[in-house]
Amino acid sequence: PGHEYWQQEVDYTIDAVLDEESQRLSATEMITYQNNSPDTLTYLWFQLDQNRFRSDSIAELSGTFNGSSPDADSNDPARISLAQLRALQYQSDSDLGHRINAVSDSRENALAHTVVGTLMRVDLLEPLRPGDDIELRIDFEYYIVNGDVLSPRGGYEHFPDDERDGGNYIFALSQWFPRLVAYTDYEGWTNKEFLGSGEFTLEFGDYAVSMTVPADHIVSATGELQNPGEVLTRDQRNRL
């Protein structure tokens, strides 16, 4: 980068609650967006990666048939595996994708927002000028996908034979919260539809995340553990 290089900064404070019985995550995130660019911004773009699993997503509607196809002059039928059929039925029957319950600024003013596939545009009440920052709040929830059915990057797996009544679950969360699209000096907004593969550029920032989970769960994440005495047994602390 040259001497006039700049990069936006986005800080997140997220409070999330995991409902194991319904496999649903609900959360509130507070976002501080610092405009380090020379441009005045009137809207912000967010990524809603979980919308990729909706049955009406571009990824699903543009996907090609991946079963076995006979030659064009053959009378044999095309075939689809039971696993593929199960995945299609699961997406059709399930209410997947991010549900945005509210978007507001620091003064609790509701902000107009438009969801387009795996993207969401939030319109600002006032222009965000160079050097200024804005605080936003987003309330959201989504049903975590069944990893055994869709083989996603993150999801849940059920262990019905666990000693706990009704079995037990393990959850792996990825691409789970609405996050700012990168705004760059070479492209502007990098607001491209997520089709299920590839990686995205993200802005630098600080994260403060709290998770409320059932008492028999252990939360594992990157970062430095702040309260081991409150959340881990002595044996577990000794293993660290």
Task: Describe each model-derived feature in a short phrase.
Residues 1-26, 174:
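N-terminal, polar/Ser/Thr-rich
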Residues 3, 14-17, 109-111, 123-128, ...:
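Beta-strand-rich interaction surfaces with strong enrichment in secreted/lumenal proteins
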Residues 11-13, 24-30, 43, 119, ...:
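Intrinsic-disorder/low-complexity, polar/charged segments enriched in Ser/Thr/Lys/Arg/Asp/Glu/Gln
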Residues 20-22, 36-40, 105-107, 126-136, ...:
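A short, structured loop/turn motif at beta-sheet edges
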Residues 22-52, 56-57, 68-74, 79-88:
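Ligand-binding face of N-terminal immunoglobulin V-set domains in extracellular IgSF glycoproteins
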Residues 29-31, 35, 48-50, 124, ...:
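Short, hydrophobic/aromatic-enriched beta-strand segments in well-ordered soluble domains
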Residues 50-60, 217-221, 235:
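Short aromatic-acidic-glycine turn motif
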Residues 69-102, 106, 139-240:
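Extended, low-hydrophobicity, Ser/Thr/Pro/Gly-biased non-transmembrane segments
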